[in-house]
Amino acid sequence: MLRNFIITTFSSFLLFTNVNAEKTTVFDFTDEEFKTLKVGKKYKGETTWTLGSNEKGNFIKAEAEGKGSGLGKEVLIDLSKTPFINITWKVEKDLSGIIENSKKGHDYAARVFVIKKTGSTALSNRAINYVFSSNNEVGKNWPSPYTKKSIDYVLSTTQENLDTWVTVKANVKEDFMKLHGINVEDISGVAIMTDTDNSKLKAISYYQDIYFSAE
């Protein structure tokens, strides 16, 4: 599921985060931050979000059954200084058997969007949708069945890691050129989403330590 989440609802994310030259932490997953996060457009209901912590710090747990919604921030990230997104995440219950590049199966147990504003309206936004796939191999990518302005890119898969914490990294600047054919110097925001409104299945996932780095 994507529909117009990035294209039309990202403008509702009006929160900002601290930025420095070496590292940009996007989400702290604290009680204070959670109270201020904006929920994006809801699809047949809202994902349940629960804060928690472990030996490596704070995380947020997402649960969705036949529904979906996202949390996001508008933050200007200089990709010439910090082009790499780093994500630590885990999928406890995946969406086995769905066809993720179809409208009926376009759900993900975990996904992280990076968004670039490329025009004067929200409809012109471009996005890369980094996903924790339930059915595809790492490195696979395809346009969203709802809009070609968002590309799904598999960074993790439950075929290799189910109910296991995984840390991944991607060069966002290079990925925008490879997937969208555009050279971007910065991005405009980041959002997370767990959704199952198309498949009607249940997903449980966790997000932790999402930040941008120089290398």
Residue ranges and their predicted role:
Residues 8-14:
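Bacterial N-terminal signal peptides
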Residues 21-43:
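Extracellular carbohydrate-recognition regions
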Residues 29, 190, 208-212:
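Extracellular beta-strand elements of beta-rich domains used
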Residues 50-70:
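Short carbohydrate-recognition loop motifs
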Residues 74-85, 159-162, 183:
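Extracellular/lumenal carbohydrate-interaction signature centered on repeated Trp-anchored short motifs
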Residues 88-94, 117-119, 173:
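Solvent-exposed strand-to-loop "edge" motifs in beta-rich extracellular domains
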Residues 105-150:
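Extracellular/luminal beta-rich ligand-recognition
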Residues 107-112, 148-149, 155-158, 162-202:
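Extracellular beta-strand ligand-recognition surfaces/modules
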